[in-house]
Structure formats: structure tokens, C-alpha cells
Amino acid sequence: MRQLIPTSAEVDDAALIEAYRLPPGRWLRCNFIASLDAAVTVNGVSAGLGSPGDRRIFHILRALADVVLVGHGTASAEGYRGIEADSAVGRLRTRLGRPATAPIAVVSRRASLTTDSGLVTDAVSPTVLITCAAADPVRRAALADAGVTVLVCGEDDVDLRLALDRLAELGHEQVLCEGGPALLHAALAAGVVDELDLSIAPALVGDGARLLPGALPDVARLELRQLLEEDGVLFTRYVLAPGTR
């Protein structure tokens, strides 16, 4: 892997960890992979665009995060499970002196997470459900009884700014958002995104979900802070420009 910006050099795992490590404090980092025509899935999942380098960065970002934020649709489509202590991410977290596991926080306006989901039954760190007051109270109560940490953030829709406040109150300040596109769009529209880590795969897909499903209220301006390359895949790290967040 070559780092192109700020300098050109080979990057090993230790250097890659330092390249993505954040200073203490609250931060919302969004991590996506997309094709050259901005498709984020092939046949409904992101794996068709992935690469070994993308997987390395995926592991590192999860290892550095306090919590992983994901929309319910993406969690279902991608078969999300909890982070296990003996997984590659769990072992890396341990080497970095962090707790071996971290919770998954699922965003669902309707509290659509089911009590028999692997995110509920198999989670080592209790899964967090971020929903709103309009969601079925019976479903919310059942999930809470099953061990899910239920956060009601907003009345008729999820208030992401409030959700991040609530996560911070639980000690989860550095948040890694893994999608999907609707959640990224909502977070950008709410002005809560600090960073976008976008892997650009050298492929053209032609259909499937796109990085953003629609127009934003205002154009989001970003500043390129880092660019790496491996096997033709570009790994970008953008920070939202002042005034955008």
C-alpha cells in the first residue's frame, strides 16, 4: 500500500493505525466503499467492491471506534453480528489496549430490530437501538427486555444529533458509521458528520444503491487529508470543511 498524500511511502499496519487514530473527543467518522460510478453495492451487498486493503482499513476503523453506527437496512442486508473478542477486530482492539468488543448501534425509526436477531442474541457488548417515540412501544419494551439498550431520540423521526449526545453520555464518543446511504444522507443533512473515509474501487457497476440517495439541503464541502492506494483502490480520508459541520 502506498500513501500518496501527505507523502509517498509504504504503509505497514502500525503506520496505518496511526494514520487513522483520532485525538480524544467526540467524532463521527463515516466509512464507505464505492465504485467509480458511486455504487456502494453489487447484488445488494458491499462485498463485491471490497479488497484486502479495504478489509484492513475496515478492521482498523472498527478497532479504533467506541461504537459502530449502522442503519437497520444495512445491518440486515449485510448480516451484521456483534464484534467478538476472538475476531480479527477484537484481537486488534486488545493489542491497542482497548476493550475487546464494542457495541453495534442500529438506527431504526420503526424499531425494526427483532429479538431473535444475532445482534440481540449473540452480542457480547449489548446492542444499542436508536429509534424515536413514534416506534411501537411494545416492540421497544421487548427489545429492552432482551438486553438491547434502547435510546429514544426524537418524536416522529430519529434525531441524529440527539442520538450522538446520548451515545456520548454512554461513553461512546468516537463513532464509526458504516451506512447505509440513507443514514449517511441523514447525517450529512443534520450536519453531524466530521469525517468521510471513502474507498474508491476501480469498477463500474451501473446499478444498485448509490453513495447518496438524493440531494442534500446544501452542498457538503470536504477537505482531503489523506490518500492511500493499493491494487488500484484509492483510500481517501476527507474531513468536512468548516461551516459544513
Functional labels for PLM-detected ranges:
Residues 1-245:
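Enzymes that bind and transform nitrogen-containing heteroaromatic metabolites
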